[in-house]
From Swiss-Prot:
InterPro entries given in the database record: Isoprenoid_synthase_dom_sf, Polyprenyl_synt, Polyprenyl_synt_CS
Lineage, broadest ranks: Bacteria, Pseudomonadati, Pseudomonadota, Gammaproteobacteria, Pasteurellales
Cofactor(s) annotated in UniProt: Mg(2+)
EC category: transferase
Transferase in keyword set: yes
Stored PANTHER family: ALL TRANS-POLYPRENYL-DIPHOSPHATE SYNTHASE PDSS1, GERANYLGERANYL PYROPHOSPHATE SYNTHASE
Family in the record: Belongs to the FPP/GGPP synthase family.
This protein's name: Octaprenyl diphosphate synthase
Binding site for Mg(2+) 1: 90, 94
Amino acid sequence: MKKQDLMSIDEIQKLADPDMQKVNQNILAQLNSDVPLIGQLGFYIVQGGGKRIRPLIAVLAARSLGFEGSNSITCATFVEFIHTASLLHDDVVDESDMRRGRATANAEFGNAASVLVGDFIYTRAFQLVAQLESLKILSIMADATNVLAEGEVQQLMNVNDPETSEANYMRVIYSKTARLFEVAGQAAAIVAGGTEAQEKALQDYGRYLGTAFQLVDDVLDYSANTQALGKNVGDDLAEGKPTLPLLHAMRHGNAQQAALIREAIEQGGKREAIDEVLAIMTEHKSLDYAMNRAKEEAQKAVDAIEILPESEYKQALISLAYLSVDRNY
């Protein structure tokens, strides 16, 4: 498939719209609770925008294997719920006050409510998996949530630590982001009755796409504008998170530059250092380095699903991979 033949994001969304409407309806239905605060906070976060890329992968993956049932909708919903719950917990841990262009749930409702409703959404996800009556998917999801939690703890340990290695950083990306993308593709393949090779292909697609997606997010933290990004530019540095662009700039800078970045990571919270850090990144092409790594991962995602039968849904998955590294939000 040539780059000029790629589908636009609007075309992909139009193709997936019948399924995604059902996913969105299911998300809202599953947030129902006799406890009013659960619904209020749940609706607040799920209606706050977001790319819905994980459920999109699930419905496109199932369709790419010719599946027309409803279990792919359940897969898409439970994957989005795990992601949503992790965001609620993330924002509390990071003390974030802005996401997707508006106040975070913890800023609006408080930390305790965010953590507890996050727990509710996590457990609701497991109820949804139980509906699929697939021990394999349950096992995959249980492992993924455990890996995600490990990634959260590892990232917490990395905060304010300039000695974080690139390998360590990439493990965190896999645990926190790529693993759940994997689940979206793999679970969809299982409910669609795909072969082992097709299941592996869609699992690999998810892993590579998830890695590319997070790498781009880390680049955008330094190169986007606040309105497009939907959060404060430079949040990672302010939070003392050593992401790939920072690690690259520190490794390639001179002693004075490396010391400045080390201090910025160790101290965190110093937004006034951003301009200096950006200048160092620009000099050493650190953002380009991270973006090129993202493009390599996106290409691996495309190559992974070469074995899938030709269809507009396969084209959509291919296009989605390329589009994920060609965005400013």
